[in-house]
Amino acid sequence: MALLVLGLVSCAFFLEVNGLYSSSDDVIELTPSNFNREVIQSDSLWLVEFYAPWCGHCQRLTPEWKKAATALKDVVKVGAVDADKHHSLGGQYGVQGFPTIKIFGSNKNRPEDYQGGRTGEAIVDAALSALRQLVKDRLGGQSGGYSSGKQGRSDSSSKKDVIELTDDSFDKNVLDSEDVWMVEFYAPWCGHCKNLEPEWAAAASEVKEQTKGKVKLAAVDATVNQVLASRYGIRGFPTIKIFQKGESPVDYDGGRTRSDIVSRALDLFSDNAPPPELLEIISEDIAKRTCEEHQLCVVSVLPHILDTGAAGRNSYLEVLLKLADKYKKKMWGWLWTEAGAQSELETALGIGGFGYPAMAAINARKMKFALLKGSFSEQGINEFLRELSFGRGSTAPVGGGAFPTIVEREPWDGRDGELPVEDDIDLSDVELDDLGKDEL
């Protein structure tokens, strides 16, 4: 096997991003600073693509998305969000893969997923269909745009997901809960509280949906529930505090738009979320999907089960799961396989020469990788991953310049390996020479 020469090239290629759209396009670039104003408060129908610059599918969609934007100009708004750069905005709408396209129609707080084709014609057809539905909704009395969310505090339907707390219910609901709570202390006469209310209500619904109820938004009338107001030193309105199990409450000091609130809530959720999945490479679909949908995929090649047994393998997997949890905010993919199970993958990554276990981090967009040179231990892997996150290290092209062929195989059953059983040989009919007459 030809040696793969590892050039001393900066690992910054892993983190390099370039937007796919420019100001000269008819595609409107959206960011956390303008999304609420441009999309949510707009009466227009919007098609929004959430993309990552390194995503191959996104790059292939780009010319078609631009074509659709030009065709729909002054009819339907077509936008794009660099969700790799603006994680909070992508997380706010549950974006887990790229590209994700959402249609913001009559109910801007509940966009629909676009499931159609990836051609300009298919996108335009879907947009016009959604536009017809928007007009029908308006004829039927449903209003589009932001005004539908601006209801007073007396309208319970607008704040159905905001949990009202009192002196009597607070401790049981909040302090005894395993969930994260964001609590607004308000006064009914407070103008700032009235301005915050529709944003808080809209955020509560989105956060509930995105976190499956693991982060809750609540409200306390501090003029009535004075025990709570005194306990937490409420001096002005509105005051928002964050409560987490076993920790002292902290003040929320972020922005007061729905987007800002949701962003902070999702950060809190990710801090308490489970680690990413650590998947065994048993098919080409698993390997390619994990690597293509993430900026990096971390691939571990563990020793053969006969060399470690189940206990030894599980100890390696525990280390990998621990580190996947530590680096979960990076949104990397995590894969593992057994030595010899995916020989073409090992060859392409130059794995095996250093023995097993081994690890490589792959950038599937650029078909380059970085190889773990240190020890396959928690400390050694952590140093390797930390260097990657800082954009440092040595890289090399993936052998063959393309994703290697993956062999389909059965997943590990969790048990120790077994040596193949050898057939017993019947020696009863074999004539053996007299040992005393052996000749040299």
Swiss-Prot record:
Enzymatic class: isomerase
Phosphoserine carried by residues: S129, S156, S158, S428
Residues annotated as domain Thioredoxin: 20-132, 124-287
Major localization listed first in the record, in broad terms: endoplasmic reticulum
Leader sequence residues: 1-19
Disulphide bond pairs: C55-C58, C190-C193
Keywords on record: Cell membrane, Chaperone, Disulfide bond, Endoplasmic reticulum, Isomerase, Membrane, Phosphoprotein, Redox-active center, Repeat, Signal
EC number in record: 5.3.4.1
CDD domains listed in its UniProt record: P5_C, PDI_a_P5
PROSITE patterns in UniProt: ER_TARGET, THIOREDOXIN_1, THIOREDOXIN_2
Reported function: May function as a chaperone that inhibits aggregation of misfolded proteins. Negatively regulates the unfolded protein response (UPR) through binding to UPR sensors such as ERN1, which in turn inactivates ERN1 signaling. May also regulate the UPR via the EIF2AK3 UPR sensor. Plays a role in platelet aggregation and activation by agonists such as convulxin, collagen and thrombin.
Quaternary context: Part of a large chaperone multiprotein complex comprising DNAJB11, HSP90B1, HSPA5, HYOU, PDIA2, PDIA4, PDIA6, PPIB, SDF2L1, UGGT1 and very small amounts of ERP29, but not, or at very low levels, CALR nor CANX. Interacts with MICA on the surface of tumor cells, leading to MICA disulfide bond reduction which is required for its release from tumor cells. Interacts with ITGB3 following platelet stimulation. Interacts with ERN1; the interaction is direct. Interacts with EIF2AK3.
Protein name: Protein disulfide-isomerase A6
Native source species: Pongo abelii
